[in-house]
Amino acid sequence: MPLFGRKKNDEALRHVPEVAVLPEPPAPGPDGLRTLEQHRDYLLDCVEELMPFGQHVLDTLGLSICEDVVSGIDLPRFDNSAMDGYAVRAADVQFATGARPVRLPVVGEVPAGGAAPHRLSPGTVMKIMTGAPVPGDADAVVPYEATDRGSTDVTVRVPSTAGQHIRRRGEDVAAGDLILRAGSRIGVRDVGLLAAIGVDKVMVRPRPRVVVISTGSELVDPGLALNPEQIYDSNSYLIAAAAKDAGAQVFRVGHVGDDPAALKQLVYDQLVRADLIITTGGVSQGDYDIVKAVLPELGATDFAAVAMQPGKPQGFGLIGEDKTPIIMLPGNPVSAFVSFEAFVRPVIRKLMGRTPYVRPGLRCAAAHAMSSIRGRTQLARGVISADETGARTVELVGGHGSHLLGDLSRADALVVLPADTEFVAAGTELEVWPLDLPR
């Protein structure tokens, strides 16, 4: 059954227009390879930030706001009590002590949410609750703890000064104050502040709807029995989780076998709900690498060899009538994940309007000597450590195989070994991409 009522037949597919034209790709180097930075910048140049729209504040956590927000009210909205106690005129109790307490009549009570009396007469007090409006002419609050908690009369044992335990109108936020600047990422505390000033909706760039598809006839969903020639589909789970971690709304479609017609139909069906499609596998030079063979039929595509390890084969395209971006990653799990961090995460950040599009890395000293391949940027798995002074070092974990998911799980960083080096001495400062920092 095709998604959302789209026709599922070859005739429908034959009439998908190739409306997209990709910009001129970067020229490869003498070795025929594109640098990691060239490919990343090319992808970022090919995609646009999503159009903003108004969303309820509770749905905006982590999103980029597209308008300045100015408070229309004061916070607090009125002078209110910071304590449970008694509203007083400070002059009436300025000389109160434990040895010579002051006793005053209680003439009323002001609960939180109640209206404040117009004024407090000299020589009287009113019970007042935390957050309740302060009566007119009262200029201090005496906490219960400094009294005998009387109901008709109260004994005050400590002096008060004007303004004590009173939260003044507008002392936190004044009407007209800039609360959030356009381009800011909305955090947990921002949601609370927006609600406090009465804002229920703000203009934000939405979470991109990302569809994840893995390819390969050998793949089986976790939980099912395996035949000897089969493996579990880890890629779609890994990349779907990474996309969700990057802030996207994710649809994991699962896997499709090495069937060109089935892949073409599946991708076409997903265009109705996708801001970005990610595939894994099928972008190399093998006889069954169907992604590279089929996807050009749905739009404009670019396949490149990138001077990086792992993750050399890469693909990108704009497909369908809406020029939906599709990023085609290699099939080995570590290659797919490293490629996601290098290329897909920056694209998702741009779609969301999250700047900088490329997250800054850390600088860490190499904990030991490391070797690399000249001409390729190595993105090796590593573990970051810090000593008691806060100085950070990084050591490599596991081997170089692009299938070693166990080593990837143990790593908390990707270590960037530059393309112009073959050997890194211990203590050399390196760029490191942390994997477990807030996104």
Identify what each model region corresponds to.
Residues 1-97, 355-381:
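Short, low-complexity N-terminal leaders and the immediately following helix N-cap/first helix
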Residues 13-37, 86-257, 393, 398, ...:
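Short, glycine/charged-enriched hinge/interface segments at domain edges or termini
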Residues 41-52, 66, 70, 171, ...:
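Generic secondary-structure signature for well-ordered alpha-helical cores
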Residues 43, 85, 176, 212, ...:
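Residue-level signal for inorganic ion chemistry
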Residues 57-58, 67, 113, 173, ...:
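Flexible glycine/proline-rich
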Residues 32, 36-40, 53, 57, ...:
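Generic structural signal for well-ordered, non-membrane alpha-helical segments
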Residues 1-37, 200-329, 333-339:
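Helix-rich terminal scaffold detector
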Residues 81, 121, 142, 272, ...:
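Structured loop/turn residues at beta-strand edges in well-structured enzyme cores
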